[in-house]
Amino acid sequence: MLSKEVVELSKQHSIIRDIFEYGMKRAKEVGAENVFDFSIGNPSVPAPKEIDETALRLLKTADPVDIHGYTSNAGVLEVRENIAKSLNKRFDTNYTAANIFMTIGAAAALGICFKTLVDGPEDEVITFAPHFPEYAVYAQGAGCRLKVISADTRAFQINFEELEETISEHTKAILINSPNNPSGVVYSRETI
């Protein structure tokens, strides 16, 4: 038997997915080079060549178990150490590997964060419209409510007045996504 809650969530309409499907259909009809897909955020810029070169080198030289096997829950220690060093160098911080928790993507990271912060159904996570529709799924999966702050439709920056009114003793997190998904807006330095 499937969870009724998840089944209902899966039935919810997503205009973003509709646009993506339409774009794929049009690409077959008129050629992919004539369709600009601004829907689901698939990367359109290749990774730096150093990434490709390193991946190929590791595939040829590293132990296959190291490449394809499981890691510790937080991720490979050496990688987390290097990420901490990079952050410290670029942003003048003092992170260590203990501050870095690697996941397989943003969805997993948000799910883990929500589960870590949420303690009961009265808890809430706040985000800003427009927002990635699956944020509601992550909040529901963590057992809390997602509160959505209306968009400032002039510039799509954060509506601080409504944010202040919405924050309560039940607020566990405020999810800020910049560049915003789905609008693509980057919050200004003043907003941040």
Residue ranges, per PLM feature:
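N-terminal small-domain helix-loop-helix segment of the aminotransferase-like
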Residues: L2, L9-G105
